[in-house]
Amino acid sequence: MKKILATAILAVSAAMFAADENIYGTITDAQGPHKGAVRYSMKSKTYFVTSKQGGALLEAEIQPGDITSMDIVEPAGWEQAVAKVEKGQAAASINYFAGIVKKYNHLQWDLRAARYLADAYLSSGNPDKALESCTAVVRADPEAAYKGELAPIFWKVLVKLGKKEQLEKLLVKAAASGDRYSSGAALIGRGDLILASGESNESLRAALVEGYLRVALMYTDGKIAEQLRPEALAKSAQCFEKIGQAGRADQMRGELKRLYPNSPWAKQ
């Protein structure tokens, strides 16, 4: 890590502080936390954290490989935009999320925004644009295709566009990633992939056994349960209903509404 202390050199940064156009957060490396205005340089492929110290500005340059943690402040308007997507008002949030993807490049929220942008496009009936937004992220970070927040919506886009072979490869990678969230999300993706070929009784049962029901029964604790179980319970209920097991369907829906009443899946 390099540190530069020079008011003249950082005149542009000072102007940005005055205009308050910065992205704020904390990046931690072996030397400790660096808190201030954060930016990523595409030219040098490094992070910069600028902070005020007395009458000068101190800028720390940090290599990605040296970072132990990163915490970027949530963008203004984020919760409202997410709520619109979850309420089925996806089109109203497209411009917002597109702007966040661009502004927060390599600063955590770009991946999260790309996930909601793809979801918004998909909900608006535009899977091609959803694929475009996912592909832009995956091109820069190939691991995002099978691991992390973007992956599940990327898989839904691939299902919608009939790209089953590509999806199959990504699900295998996710299952082998060692990441519990990605492994669980891959099981839901597996169920979606099975049903993409048709909803016969055989395929509905396979989607349950190989996908949805495994998540509903095995991922029952912590944050991952909140992230994955609502969708798994909802889709399990749908499958049970379609194969004529109304009692099991009611059981799944009852558990969904009791444990996750605020989930969009509980309100469908």
Description of each model-found segment:
Residues 18-142, 149-160, 169, 175, ...:
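Compositionally biased alpha-helical segments
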Residues 138-139, 210-217, 237-264:
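TPR/TPR-like (Sel1-like) alpha-helical repeat modules
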Residues 212, 227-236:
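Surface-exposed aromatic
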Residues 164:
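Mixed-charge (Asp/Glu-Lys/Arg
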Residues 37, 125, 179, 187, ...:
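Mature soluble domains of exported/periplasmic/lumenal proteins and thiol-rich metal-chelating peptides
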Residues 9-18:
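Hydrophobic h-region of N-terminal signal peptides that target proteins for export
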Residues 108-110, 142-150, 179-186, 218-228, ...:
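Boundary/linker segments of alpha-helical solenoid repeat arrays
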Residues 1-4:
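Positively charged n-region of N-terminal signal peptides that target proteins for export
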